[in-house]
């Protein structure tokens, strides 16, 4: 995604210039799906590769997020070691976000594993991005304000209860707002909704008693026509 698709965001520059401007500090995972020429390019640029193919119980995204949280934890606490999800959820720099490019689109089972990782690391604020959608988890028992970039996001959006029923959900800033409604897979879910933030100061507010996956259309981010 970084090597092949990042140049599409900057069509005014050559692909080589864009790739040289966005060099990862580390490549983490099984490394089985990375083309040799991509590894060679980033290796020459100083990127460190961490081969974790011995661990077949977690996905590449899970490994990458754990590595990032672990590194941040060492910097903040002066100690390191492997992190389980309890450590990852200890309020690591709540102003940070992890953007997982390429996490949506492609194989459905891969998408579901990435959604699962976003739920597991909900306190680490993992944002999943694909060519047409962006998604992140709204935690249970919270009231959150989201300020979408309406020039690049939407209008399509949705709220999906991926982890079980949500008994009461309230929203503002949507075309079809929820007023304490219950959301549940197999019954009512709020897909094919739309942003309508003109009367809410540019923000969407979501109040929920259960985790919800918030998603918006980002086709325009990639110079594609929104569906």
Each language-model region and where it sits:
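Short, solvent-exposed coil/turn elements at secondary-structure transition points
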Residues: 33, 55-56, 132-134, 165
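Acidic/Gly/His-enriched mid-domain segments of enzyme catalytic cores or analogous surface patches
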Residues: 1-122
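Class I SAM-dependent methyltransferase SAM-binding "motif I" and its flanking Rossmann-like core
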Residues: 109-110, 114, 118-149
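Structural recognition of alpha->loop->beta junctions
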Residues: 13-27, 121-125, 147-151, 156-167
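Short, surface-exposed, polar/charged, turn-prone segments marking secondary-structure boundaries
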Residues: 54-58, 78-80, 125-129, 186-189, ...
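Short beta-strand segments
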Residues: 101-103, 129, 160, 207
